[in-house]
Amino acid sequence: MATSNLLKNKGSLQFEDKWDFMRPIVLKLLRQESVTKQQWFDLFSDVHAVCLWDDKGPAKIHQALKEDILEFIKQAQARVLSHQDDTALLKAYIVEWRKFFTQCDILPKPFCQLEITLMGKQGSNKKSNVEDSIVRKLMLDTWNESIFSNIKNRLQDSAMKLVHAERLGEAFDSQLVIGVRESYVNLCSNPEDKLQIYRDNFEKAYLDSTERFYRTQAPSYLQQNGVQNYMKYADAKLKEEEKRALRYLETRRECNSVEALMECCVNALVTSFKETILAECQGMIKRNETEKLHLMFSLMDKVPNGIEPMLKDLEEHIISAGLADMVAAAETITTDSEKYVEQLLTLFNRFSKLVKEAFQDDPRFLTARDKAYKAVVNDATIFKLELPLKQKGVGLKTQPESKCPELLANYCDMLLRKTPLSKKLTSEEIEAKLKEVLLVLKYVQNKDVFMRYHKAHLTRRLILDISADSEIEENMVEWLREVGMPADYVNKLARMFQDIKVSEDLNQAFKEMHKNNKLALPADSVNIKILNAGAWSRSSEKVFVSLPTELEDLIPEVEEFYKKNHSGRKLHWHHLMSNGIITFKNEVGQYDLEVTTFQLAVLFAWNQRPREKISFENLKLATELPDAELRRTLWSLVAFPKLKRQVLLYEPQVNSPKDFTEGTLFSVNQEFSLIKNAKVQKRGKINLIGRLQLTTERMREEENEGIVQLRILRTQEAIIQIMKMRKKISNAQLQTELVEILKNMFLPQKKMIKEQIEWLIEHKYIRRDESDINTFIYMA
């Protein structure tokens, strides 16, 4: 019943009945006059009633509002246009705009029902949004048509003049510029792009005036103050302009005005003078002017391709300065691996400090440092290693390589072996220095050479039991694994340690078995090392030597013992790798001499005739040693550098072991003794093994040839691996992938790659594509 009465009475309340009460409140709100709480609520109620009861009410309210808003704006227009001066006009406009813009948020609120009725919205479904309000749009559109569109160019010009004045150091009320921007941002009637008018006018004018300003100012500043002061100027202006842009330009997320302004400033202040600024880079790097370089870096990083020339300058400097320092110290570092590694580390730390302080460890500059340092490490100018290659019976030489991996291995040996260097260092210091070696090793191209030498040194340390710290020795194996050394190589090193531990158990069992037996030598004095041929990679060459009877008699006992525990395995004796301690007695005193098996065999020749002179020819017959090994062994006994009185004497005198003749006579020095602090010692111990290699000359040649042969096999394997996966591949792509696979071992030379491709084609593993000779196809 109530609903039907309402419908029957619909139309009884008209717009005209309420507008006279509503209008004074609307005018008060427009003029920013105070309104009571009751008037505010009455306005809400009256708008709601008119929209509900008068069918034409919403349209009439909209029209009436439009007229009153227009009238109010005309009054504001008159106040603004009364000023002829542009600055005064701008100030007056901003005063009026501020008041009006505030009311644009307040006046629409009581007219929510009008929004719902005109737009067909359901108030219960969607909250009214003031920014989308019809009343607000009406207010802003009317302001735009009546005032802003007519004077916007004058306002904009005035605003740009104020910004220009601020750049010259003058102060003003920043709200004058901000108000103009707000007008542009809020007075756009395009619903698709509300920032269109702002972008096309205010932003464009701001960017254009900025560019004009610096196109004039920058060149003259550069000419008057020079590049280095100009960089400070440009940096300061870029920061200043960014702060200014954040004040005066629109910063909402969908607008990129600040970014556009900064790009404009970079073009005017930096890009235009890119070549002039970059011309200073090389000199700054040489003079280590890190602060200036950092400033240049921050400027050039804003310019497309601005960093590339700096990277090139850094690379060139590191290579030239690094090699110059190495050449200057060549006399020392070529003979002293410790000094060599220290020199390399000094260079690395110096260049790393430069990159950190000047370029904040930017990845691009770190890459440039690494590339250049790698060139220094692998340079073969100062000292080189030539690896021989036997091919079809002809001795060839590969392209010379840096001796760096060999010297790094030598330095590791000095740290890991019992040496004066390792003795004065703590375990922590040794570990730190080994980690430094591994750092340099990362830059070595031909790591396989390091592996060969490192393994040779490790073999010597384990066999002679001269490791400074067994725990660090084993840690080193894991560190090599961590830095990416090939697994098969690292596994062999680990197996070597395993063999030593197994040998210790075997020795214990052997001694236990023979503790009550009478052997040629007491079991306690014997230390047997049973080594796996695969892990230790010993040469197939066996050097024969006539052993003393005591050793000859011991060998069958060891073999019998081993066969009982390991049936089916055969022992191959490597006397070359053996060593022992013998006692030397004379009238002066008694001395223990640590000797190789070859030295022992030579010295035992005098056991039955201690005072006789024996010729080189007879010693050869007695020991049955090869000529080269006998010469080397004798020289170690007649010219041992640490002894003031040598073990053997000889005549006539010669300059090198090569000068020994069949008739050279050798005799035991009956006055041999150890001298300490200029005093003759009656007892003592001396190691005569020294740096004698536990390999023959031929074995060393084999090892160097082995490096090359292994490279050939690795290259062939890698090519087959790639071809199996790709089936068909271009020459360029094959070479790229090949280097990627082999880079942790060595860098294959183009000549070697070409030769192995031809070998694989010849043996029908791959073939050339008939339509393109630079494409290869895998043959299953």
From Swiss-Prot:
Changing W53A: Strongly impaired interaction with HIV-1 Vif protein. Decreased interaction ith SOCS2. Its main location: nucleus. Pathway: Protein modification; protein ubiquitination. Residues 711-772 form the Cullin neddylation domain. Pfam families: Cullin (PF00888), Cullin_Nedd8 (PF10557). The modification Phosphothreonine is found at T210. Neddylated; which enhances the ubiquitination activity of ECS complexes and prevents binding of the inhibitor CAND1. Deneddylated via its interaction with the COP9 signalosome (CSN). It is found in: Nucleus. Keywords: Host-virus interaction, Isopeptide bond, Nucleus, Phosphoprotein, Receptor, Ubl conjugation, Ubl conjugation pathway. One of its GO terms (molecular function) is ubiquitin ligase complex scaffold activity. There is a cross-link at K724 (Glycyl lysine isopeptide (Lys-Gly) (interchain with G-Cter in NEDD8)). GO terms for cellular component: Cul5-RING ubiquitin ligase complex; cytosol; nucleus; SCF ubiquitin ligase complex; site of DNA damage. Belongs to the cullin family. Core component of multiple cullin-5-RING E3 ubiquitin-protein ligase complexes (ECS complexes, also named CRL5 complexes), which mediate the ubiquitination and subsequent proteasomal degradation of target proteins. Acts a scaffold protein that contributes to catalysis through positioning of the substrate and the ubiquitin-conjugating enzyme. The functional specificity of the E3 ubiquitin-protein ligase complex depends on the variable SOCS box-containing substrate recognition component. This is Cullin-5.
